[in-house]
Every structure is written in structure tokens, then in C-alpha cells.
């Protein structure tokens, strides 16, 4: 039984390690973004504010399922007969809630909110992951946009 619990735990940790928030940074492009034409504009940073980017609730499903399975296994080791069934169900519910919480915490990443006055006079706000590049007010930046997403980089 211990081997099963250990195997399920390792599988859950392996899946959790697959979370990748690097594409939220202005320093990283996905494979589908490479070699794509992007419109470029220029601007100046007006204000910089650190923010926290929370992954979507849909991504917490893996944590909830993994936690429920692990909790069910652990609950199944308690008691016998009806007590075992109740412990299995309670363990699955508690494990699911705990697993979702752990996955939610893992999906948080440090970001930066950039208020940018574009050279055309418009002011925009962009939130992206805080990568290796540090931004500051007054800094000139280049904005690369594919129509639905924009990436801010130093000029």
C-alpha cells in the first residue's frame, strides 16, 4: 500500500513540475510565436508596479485530481467495512481540496504592470511576467504585437 501511495505522490509531483509560466515573460517566445510577423510600436514607461499573476482555475484540476486520488488511498488504509468507505470518501474530498490549493499556489508568478505612453500619444497598460529585464519609469521600450498579445522589451 505504501508503494502505491508513493507512486501516486511521485506522479502528482511530476505533473506539477510541468507547469510553465515562462511564456508570460517578455523575454520568452513560444514556438508558435517564432518566425511570425509582429507589428512594432515604441513608447516610454510612465509607471511600473509589481503584481502577482495567478494561473487560471482550470489549471488547478490536475492538483485536485491528484490530491483526491492520494487522499482516497490514504483514507482507504483507515478502518474496516463501512468505516473504511467513509474514510476513503473523506480522504478523497480533503485530498482534492488540498491538492487544488497546492496547485493554485504553484501557478502564481511574479509579474510587472507597465503603464506605457506610446509615441502616438495613447497610453496603454501591459502586464507580463517579470523576466530578467528590469523596467523603470522613463525607460524607452518597444512593443511587439501580433494582434491579440503584446510583448514589451527594452529599446
Curated annotation (Swiss-Prot):
GO terms for cellular component: cell outer membrane. InterPro entries: Bact_OM_lipoprot/Surf_antigen, Gly_zipper_2TM_dom. A lipid is attached at residue 18 (S-diacylglycerol cysteine). The keyword Membrane applies. It is found in: Cell outer membrane. Keywords: Cell outer membrane, Lipoprotein, Membrane, Palmitate, Signal. Residues 1-17 form the signal peptide. A lipid is attached at residue 18 (N-palmitoyl cysteine). It is a lipid-anchor. Belongs to the Pcp/SlyB lipoprotein family. This is Outer membrane lipoprotein SlyB. It comes from Salmonella typhimurium (strain LT2 / SGSC1412 / ATCC 700720). The gene is slyB.
Amino acid at each position: 500500500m505504501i508503494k502505491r501511495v508513493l507512486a501516486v505522490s511521485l506522479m502528482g509531483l511530476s505533473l506539477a513540475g510541468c507547469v510553465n509560466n515562462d511564456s508570460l515573460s517578455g523575454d520568452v517566445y513560444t514556438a508558435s510565436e517564432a518566425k511570425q510577423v509582429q507589428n512594432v510600436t515604441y513608447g516610454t514607461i510612465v509607471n511600473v508596479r509589481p503584481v502577482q499573476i495567478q494561473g487560471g482555475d482550470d489549471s488547478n484540476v490536475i492538483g485536485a485530481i491528484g490530491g483526491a486520488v492520494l487522499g482516497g488511498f490514504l483514507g482507504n488504509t483507515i478502518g474496516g467495512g463501512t468505516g473504511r468507505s467513509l474514510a476513503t470518501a473523506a480522504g478523497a474530498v480533503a485530498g482534492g481540496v488540498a491538492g487544488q490549493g497546492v496547485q493554485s499556489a504553484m501557478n502564481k508568478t511574479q509579474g510587472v504592470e507597465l503603464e506605457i505612453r506610446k509615441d502616438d500619444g495613447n497610453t496603454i497598460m501591459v502586464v507580463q511576467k517579470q523576466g530578467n529585464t528590469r523596467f523603470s519609469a522613463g525607460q524607452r521600450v518597444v512593443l511587439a504585437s501580433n494582434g491579440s498579445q503584446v510583448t514589451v522589451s527594452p529599446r
